[in-house]
Amino acid sequence: MFQPLIDYLRERSVLILGFGREGRSTYRLIREFLPEKEISIADKFPVTIEDKNVNLFCGDGYMSVINDFEVVIKSPGISVRDVEIKENVTVTCQTDLFLKFGGCKCIGITGTKGKTTTSTLTYLILKAAGINTALIGNIGVPVFESLGNAEKMIPVIELSSHQLEFTRTSPHIGVLTNVYPEHLDHYNGFKGYVNAKLNIVRNQKENDIFIYNADQGISEFIDESEIKSKKIGISAEDAEKDPFLKELVSCNPRLLGRHNRFDILLAATAARALGIEDKFIRAGIESFDGIPHRMENVGTYKGITFYNDSIATIPEAVMCAVEALKKVGSLIIGGNDRGLDYSDFIKDLSGCNVDNIICLPETGHAIGNSLKEMGSDKNIIIAKDMDCLLYTSP
């Protein structure tokens, strides 16, 4: 599979934009197959590398060199919205190059929330069915690390909006779990964020499959006539119509809550689209043993059970966890302000079954003060930092 990609890069000037985990992975691949090729690396932070054929551009002005190259392989999370990119410059990423040159049928999964769980469940189902697969992408494994075996496998790729932003090739099976406002600071608004997410389906062909959340719908985000692939809308009600699915969504006690049940439905639908038998779907779901930071039971102390749900960075995810766990004594909230509207979240918190709401900077303080102003009967604790909580008794 390497050859088409290597041929593409061989005759073009290449800039690796960002030298984190994915950038280093890109460098290793190019250097392995093109040992003498001149490579340029740009990063805001210092880069140390012993390679006579590498040019480094580091520091605050690292973005200024983008238009000096034919191909820019960008790391996720680096925003180039303030750079006027010339027409002869191709800004791409590992994900796009993998989908374009990989020569395999990929399952790509994205969404504001649920993509990691859905990706993991899908991967476990494929493994249970004896299919050669890999779980790669936003889950923490750069896609280039599976490049060598791509033609012989069906990889499951977790795709963030950052990875999709410059992806112009869509996977054979694309799954969109949901879309809620997030990363608005990066995309300068909700529209830009949604446009990035929709690259998962935008370039699919007639023989491809797009699985989406029918309860939320997609018509407000994209003209459905633009979608060339087969569309499969999944609703929570589907579990009631199918005896197997009805039993499946409750077969694993680690997958609590309606959001996890929906992730199961999406993964099962993707597996069925590949022709996988129900017995393997069930085996895969049953083998799931949880994901760190997602309603993770971290232990019990003095009769109090603690859950780490720190991946819940939007209000909808927080409320799903509160609903799934039933009786929550204390909820700790806070984090950076990314420009989200918290008005509905404040109302939901005021009416939910939580006794104590502990508010950390910076969003937590604003939410806590709003709850106090509206006369909420919750015990609102405004804390300076986590250390202060050790000396605070609700």
What spans do the regions from the language model cover?
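Residues at the starts of beta-strands that form the adenosine-phosphate
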Residues: 13, 37-38, 132, 172-173, ...
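Short internal beta-strands
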Residues: 40-44, 211-213, 332-333, 355-362
